[in-house]
């Protein structure tokens, strides 16, 4: 981390418009591009909105406009993301990653100490969990924030199940929030299920189980401002219908990565599994307690189930085909189970050594095994992530500078792999494409009128020039003013006009790309009848328009409708008749009007109300039963 930011920004040397000017070298981590194309642009957008005093509820720069807080993976409400959110990418990104590792290690150590493992065994488990192959591989992704918080939840849930206190109740609620706010609901659900099983095993009687479950429910309510908008967005997404879902399991040959972490076959991220050979052997030794210990049986069962649902077999194939979850993601939970088993195995081995060699020799041997496991894991972690100098995170080009200086509302349509989806979010440009786990289903249907979108090996959501729809009417209606493409592609304005009936003119050609202007583009805000519209205020979640209509007509704002958008004409609520995914339309009478169109999602307000109620309930419970 001292050499630069753990980011694969060097992938931009293979993508336009940066390819001609970005320092060209071999891409260090070609599969770790999601942070570059998704998470960093989202972070920069969130910082812009928060610095302006606005909640980043809506992202106008992706897929025509989509919920931002509701996409879950933005993860801006997680304390583990706070360093990056407060300090920016250059100063805060690595701090956020380091914080995730530290929280995971400390939480795992404290939990293992609480279940009566020795210091050496707890240290071993902490290393196996916090710097395991899966933890390091997914470190730049939001999923790592979910995983880092699990041992803390295990620790506090175990204590609450054994001793009733206000502090314990509040601790479980807050730890549950940390897991849910991490930015990966799929993994969070798996984690909560694992913690629930472990807690039920520890609790004696139904009362401890009920109070622990109630505390977790309060934690769910604390996260409601994130979960309720996510549920709404998911219900309207293509993902809810299983569209574009990759159905896969991990090859059985990928089990070799437990022994050889840098094997060259398969995907080095999804298949990452090493917990060190030392740790794996100690975990197998810990299975010797499987008959005597319910805890060992439970965590051995968890490890077995994770392997079964992740690696190729009839069960995993059935789950992959017929359920909406990516079960291979559960592999990131495996170091938790193996860490517990290895800690148990180390203490068992130490007890045997103590009887034969004495206390001091047994302690030295245990410490040596911990050091060996840590060294093995650190060696395996080297080279997983790329290192980017801070000055290379946000390179710009003449073409991009030209676009970002234009003040009027417009959309762009990069063709082929030019400016990969979501990159526009960092630049403040409105793109019709997007790259996200969930995408509005209705918008994808509307967008088909622009052309046939596909994917390539390196970029998702691609419109090739040859796949443009004839006529270009959808480009005009949706305010797509500029088409961007590689300078070496043989598609000039004249050729596209001739082949597809467009009306484009080339206004820029440089080493960084070709910029074509759509001369037929319609304004973002316009009237169907005669009159004028002036945009006086434009924010992510609010538009203010001065309208002068000569007759009763319809005001069209060419942004895709989504639940939560509201309209007011001269301060009075006005109906929006548009269907989800179609342009926002508001009827106005003849004359001058001030129209405000704002995003006020009921889902967020409902979630915020649930959060406030949870805080009140939490305060009352702590006050009633006392803190300690």
Identify the function of each model-found stretch:
Residues 115, 158-169, 200-211, 288-294, ...:
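Membrane-interface junctions at the ends of membrane-embedded or membrane-associated helices
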Residues 2-115, 120-149, 261-267, 578:
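Active-site lumenal/periplasmic loops and adjacent helix-entry segments of GT-C-fold
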Residues 2-3, 50, 81-91, 120-141, ...:
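Membrane-interface helix-loop junctions at the exits of transmembrane helices
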Residues 11, 15-18, 248, 371, ...:
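Extracytoplasmic
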Residues 58, 433, 508-511, 519-628:
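Active-site-proximal, structured, solvent-exposed surfaces of multi-pass membrane proteins
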Residues 105-114, 119-203, 212-230, 236, ...:
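Membrane-embedded helix bundles of polyisoprenyl
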Residues 12-50, 54, 216-289, 316, ...:
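Periplasmic/ER-lumenal interhelical loops and adjacent helix-loop junctions
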Residues 275-297, 304, 308, 354, ...:
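Hydrophobic, aromatic-rich transmembrane alpha-helices
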């Amino acid at each position: 981390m001292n050499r630069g930011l753990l980011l694969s920004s060097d992938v931009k040397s293979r993508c336009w418009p940066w390819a001609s000017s970005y320092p060209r070298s071999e891409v260090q981590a070609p599969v770790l591009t999601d942070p570059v194309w998704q998470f960093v642009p989202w972070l920069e957008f969130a910082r812009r909105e928060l610095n302006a005093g606005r909640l980043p509820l809506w992202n106008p720069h992706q897929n025509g406009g989509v919920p931002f807080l509701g996409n879950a993976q933005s993860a801006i409400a997680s304390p583990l993301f706070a360093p990056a959110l407060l300090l920016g990418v250059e100063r805060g990104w690595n701090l956020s990653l380091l914080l995730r590792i530290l929280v995971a290690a400390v939480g795992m150590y404290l939990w293992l100490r609480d279940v009566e493992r020795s210091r050496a065994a707890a240290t071993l488990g902490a290393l196996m969990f916090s710097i395991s192959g899966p933890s390091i591989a997914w470190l730049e992704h939001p999923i790592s924030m979910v995983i880092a918080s699990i041992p803390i939840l295990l620790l506090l849930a175990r204590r609450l199940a054994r001793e009733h206190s206000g502090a314990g109740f509040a601790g479980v609620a807050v730890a549950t929030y940390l897991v849910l706010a991490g930015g990966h609901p799929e993994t969070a659900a798996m984690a909560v299920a694992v913690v629930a099983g472990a807690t039920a095993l520890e609790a004696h009687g139904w009362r401890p189980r009920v109070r622990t479950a109630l505390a977790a429910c309060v934690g769910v309510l604390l996260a409601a401002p994130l979960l309720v908008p996510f549920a709404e967005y998911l219900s309207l997404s293509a993902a809810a219908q299983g569209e574009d879902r990759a159905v896969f399991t991990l090859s059985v040959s990928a089990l070799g990565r437990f022994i050889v972490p840098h094997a060259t076959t398969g995907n080095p991220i999804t298949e990452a599994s090493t917990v060190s050979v030392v740790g794996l052997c100690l975990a197998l030794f810990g299975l010797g307690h499987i008959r005597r210990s319910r805890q060992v049986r439970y965590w051995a069962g968890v490890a077995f189930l994770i392997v079964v649902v992740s690696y190729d077999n009839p069960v995993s194939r059935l789950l992959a085909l017929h359920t909406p979850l990516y079960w291979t993601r559960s592999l990131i939970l495996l170091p938790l189970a193996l860490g517990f088993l290895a800690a148990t195995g180390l203490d068992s081995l130490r007890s045997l050594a103590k009887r034969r060699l004495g206390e001091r020799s047994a302690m030295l041997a245990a410490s040596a095994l911990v050091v060996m496991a840590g060294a093995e894991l650190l060696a395996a972690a080297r080279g997983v992530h790329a290192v980017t100098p801070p000055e290379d995170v946000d390179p710009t080009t003449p073409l991009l500078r030209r676009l970002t200086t234009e003040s009027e509302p417009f959309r762009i349509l990069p063709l082929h792999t030019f400016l990969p989806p979501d990159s526009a979010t960092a630049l403040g440009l409105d793109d019709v494409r997007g790259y996200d786990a969930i995408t509005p289903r209705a918008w994808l249907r509307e967008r088909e009128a622009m052309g046939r979108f596909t994917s390539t090996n390196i970029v998702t959501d691609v419109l090739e020039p040859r796949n443009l729809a004839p006529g270009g009417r959808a480009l005009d209606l949706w305010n797509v003013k500029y088409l961007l493409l590689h300078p070496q592609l043989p598609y000039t304005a004249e050729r596209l006009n001739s082949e597809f009936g467009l009306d484009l003119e080339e206004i820029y050609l440089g080493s960084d790309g070709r910029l074509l202007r759509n001369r037929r583009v319609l304004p973002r805000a316009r009237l169907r009848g005669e009159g004028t519209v002036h945009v006086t205020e434009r924010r992510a979640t609010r538009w203010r328009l001065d309208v002068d209509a000569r007759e009763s007509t319809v005001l069209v704002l060419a942004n895709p409708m989504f639940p939560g958008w509201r309209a007011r004409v001269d301060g009075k609520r006005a109906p929006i008749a548009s269907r989800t995914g179609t342009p926002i339309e508001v009827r106005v009478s003849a004359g001058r009007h001030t129209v405000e169109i704002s995003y006020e999602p009921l889902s967020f307000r409902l979630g915020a109300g649930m959060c406030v109620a949870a805080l009140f309930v939490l305060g009352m419970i702590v006050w009633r039963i006392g803190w300690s």
